């Protein structure tokens, strides 16, 4: 992610939450617009039960005399990532607020990002960062266990999107094959005409 682009769309699947948050926070502070999709597929190192206990401990933290005064505990995976990123930038300053304006986070892959090229961040990928065999937790599963209600809805929409995506890819593949065949035949006919002009 060193090159500056108009908007970078990151596929969150298989990335470690904290590592991705640190990289994204640096990029948005530098002026890069970033969109993170499939936040429910983000990973946290450590087994599920341990992470659930940690989250319940975090849920206990509240203003003693009035819980409505915060701190507010987000349950949705996209908001968990958002809060992790927010904690890594000076969000109370004008510069930090402007940086957060450049960030968008989503569960699933909503339009128009389903038609955009998605990238991964190798420095934050679980398979490259955690030792093989280490336990990890999916943020979607953790969120669902602590009160997020839309896991089934997101799963249904994702299945629908994957079917449409597979159909689109098959059509594109067939069209590319046809185009390449047409180009090859045109090149052959042009070569034949030139040879005929020289009497071959």
UniProtKB/Swiss-Prot annotation:
GO BP field: cellular response to starvation; filamentous growth; filamentous growth of a population of unicellular organisms in response to biotic stimulus; filamentous growth of a population of unicellular organisms in response to starvation; negative regulation of translation; translation
Pfam short name (any one): Ribosomal_L13
Keywords: Cytoplasm, Ribonucleoprotein, Ribosomal protein
Keyword Cytoplasm: yes
Single GO term (MF): structural constituent of ribosome
SUPFAM superfamilies: Ribosomal protein L13
Protein family: Belongs to the universal ribosomal protein uL13 family.
Role summary: Component of the ribosome, a large ribonucleoprotein complex responsible for the synthesis of proteins in the cell. The small ribosomal subunit (SSU) binds messenger RNAs (mRNAs) and translates the encoded message by selecting cognate aminoacyl-transfer RNA (tRNA) molecules. The large subunit (LSU) contains the ribosomal catalytic site termed the peptidyl transferase center (PTC), which catalyzes the formation of peptide bonds, thereby polymerizing the amino acids delivered by tRNAs into a polypeptide chain.
Protein name: Large ribosomal subunit protein uL13
